Regions:
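Active-site environment of non-heme Fe oxygenases that use a 2-His-1-carboxylate facial triad
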Residues: 1-10, 16-18, 42-216
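Glycine-rich, aromatic-bearing surface loops/beta-hairpins
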Residues: 25, 39-42
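A structured, charge-rich N-terminal accessory region that forms the first stable segment of a protein
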Residues: 14-16, 24, 34
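Short secondary-structure junctions
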Residues: 32-38
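N-terminal functional module of multi-domain proteins
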Residues: 9, 26-32
Length: 216
């Protein structure tokens, strides 16, 4: 697993002997310090496609509901985004929703593009803890990118969004098709992920269920 994370930024395997949540926590503990996505919540978070009225306010689920999710890194609204994401499939559902990955290192970005991404300023909204930040920085190893919580503050940041939108369109996407008990680990400082559209977008009864543990 560690070799795969180092080489390509992600690893996929299967649950072995433990129950799914225990195995996710065991992997997370091997990688660093597990941490809950929201204060006073369980370390293991259940992720299901849902309508806005059932989702956390301002989350991607609230904004995009049952449709596809844009590419992003998790916890972009934290001062330092989590290092790893450990996900497991409790149920793949019947609508063939895939997780899509893009390796930041594979993006076709020239020096001019990188300079814009380093200098364009975004407002990162997190209630009273909101702050300003760029997408990348010479001082940090991580990417900060999530249009669900990052807002352009001027022409430069709008150009930065266009640069990445173009790079994403041209990039190679890795499709993760889920089966029960699959486990996926992502280097959240390198791999952006999104969610594909449902094969039945009108369905409100999709039982797909992923469990997630974040690692500092």
């Amino acid at each position: 697993m560690l070799d795969s994370l180092q080489e390509r930024g992600w690893w996929k395997g299967q649950r072995l002997e433990l129950n799914l949540d225990d195995e996710l926590c065991q992997i997370a503990n091997c990688l660093g310090q597990p941490i809950g996505a929201r204060r006073r919540r369980s370390i293991v978070e259940v992720l299901k496609p849902m309508s806005a009225d059932l989702a956390y306010a301002n989350s991607l689920s609230a904004q995009y509901q049952l449709s596809s999710f844009p590419f992003h890194v998790d916890t972009a609204h934290w001062p330092t985004p989590c290092k790893y994401i450990v996900m497991g499939c409790k149920s793949p559902g019947s609508c063939d929703r895939k997780t899509l990955l893009i390796d930041w290192k594979s993006l076709q970005l020239d020096d001019s593009d990188m300079n814009v991404l380093k200098n364009a300023v975004f407002l990162v909204k997190d209630g009273a803890r909101s702050f300003y930040s760029s997408i990348i920085s010479d001082n940090n190893d991580f990417i900060r990118y999530d249009i669900g919580c990052m807002y352009a503050t001027g022409p430069d940041s709008k150009i930065a969004l266009k640069i990445l939108s173009s790079a994403f369109r041209k990039s190679v996407k890795i499709e993760i098709k889920w089966e029960e008990d699959d486990i996926l680990v992502l280097d959240n400082w390198r791999i952006l992920h999104g969610r594909s559209r449902s094969s039945d977008p009108m369905s409100m009864n999709e039982p797909r269920e992923l469990h997630r543990v974040l690692v500092k």
